[in-house]
């Protein structure tokens, strides 16, 4: 009971976070005639690696430059994103089979496949990764044995059946599972790019690959400014109104007020 309650609370918190991040950009988009938006946030970006993101800013950034099988609508409900549709689980509620969009691409033009999800999820639960996001996968088959060292990460309940079919097996029924899949921890990762980049993956804009509405530019891993630039390879780019969003870390209220009044 405690485990289920913890998961529901965590999911509720992340929904509020993602809606506050994505929602603000979306609402401003409708109001602005210009194609460039400037926003302020209250803390630095610690990482662009979905397996390691653990704070509010990182989760917000992930939601702008990445996308999973589902995303949250304005009411906080899960809607299909990289998955073509919501699905019904098996009769016992343990197996979900998702179809991946065939027009989904990474920012480098490579297709997004079911393997990108399998690789990402197994990387996150791997004890060697030491991911603060691993607990989100608690409901997947063999999760507990993997994090305890009794089983290999390869035995996690997720399998790429083919390039566009992903099968997920749970340890117990979770009525909110498809809602959970909108959380950044469940975003895909391009295995070839991550392995080539190694430990540098997600430490700067250049060492990260994107699949969301925007790509990240101008972030070197330590600076307080960066930009979201419209991803030309995003499958739904026709519905992305902004060309660019300039972000600046503003920790002091008065500083933010001065920047606003100075139109910076």
Protein language model features and the residues they cover:
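C-terminal motif of bacterial Sec signal peptides marking the signal peptidase cleavage site
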Residues: 18-21
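Bacterial signal peptide processing site
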Residues: 23-26
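Short, well-ordered beta-strand elements
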Residues: 33-43, 95-98, 117-120, 166-167, ...
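N-terminal lobe/hinge region of extracytoplasmic solute-binding protein
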Residues: 40-91, 209
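Aromatic- and charge-enriched surface segment that lines or borders ligand/interaction sites
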Residues: 85-136
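Short helices/loops that flank or line small-molecule/ion binding pockets
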Residues: 109-111, 116, 254-264
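Surface-exposed binding/hinge segments that line
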Residues: 118, 133-192
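Gly/Pro-rich hinge or "lid" segments in bacterial periplasmic/extracellular proteins
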Residues: 170-240, 244, 254
């Amino acid at each position: 009971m405690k485990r289920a309650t913890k998961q529901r609370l965590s999911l509720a918190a992340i929904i509020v976070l993602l809606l506050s991040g994505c929602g603000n950009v979306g609402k401003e988009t409708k109001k602005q005639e210009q194609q460039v938006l400037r926003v302020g946030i209250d803390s630095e970006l610690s990482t662009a690696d979905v397996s390691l993101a653990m704070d509010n800013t990182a989760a917000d950034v992930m939601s702008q430059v990445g996308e999973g099988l589902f995303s949250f609508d304005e009411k906080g409900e899960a809607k299909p994103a990289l998955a073509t549709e919501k699905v019904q689980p098996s009769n016992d509620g343990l197996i979900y089979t998702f179809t991946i969009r065939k027009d989904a691409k990474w920012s480098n033009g490579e297709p997004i496949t079911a393997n990108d999800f399998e690789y990402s999820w197994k990387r996150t639960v791997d004890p060697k990764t030491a991911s603060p996001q691993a607990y989100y996968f608690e409901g997947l088959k063999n999760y507990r044995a993997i994090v305890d060292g009794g089983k290999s990460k390869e035995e996690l309940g997720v399998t790429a059946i083919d390039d566009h079919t992903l099968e997920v097996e749970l340890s117990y029924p979770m009525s909110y599972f498809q809602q959970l899949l909108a959380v950044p921890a469940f975003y895909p990762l391009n295995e070839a790019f991550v392995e080539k980049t190694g430990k540098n993956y997600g430490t700067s804009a250049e060492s990260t690959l994107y699949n969301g509405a925007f790509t990240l530019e101008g972030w070197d891993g330590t600076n307080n400014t960066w930009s979201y630039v419209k991803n030309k390879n995003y499958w739904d780019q026709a519905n992305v109104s902004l060309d660019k969003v300039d972000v600046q870390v503003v920790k002091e209220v008065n500083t933010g007020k001065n920047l606003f009044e100075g139109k910076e």
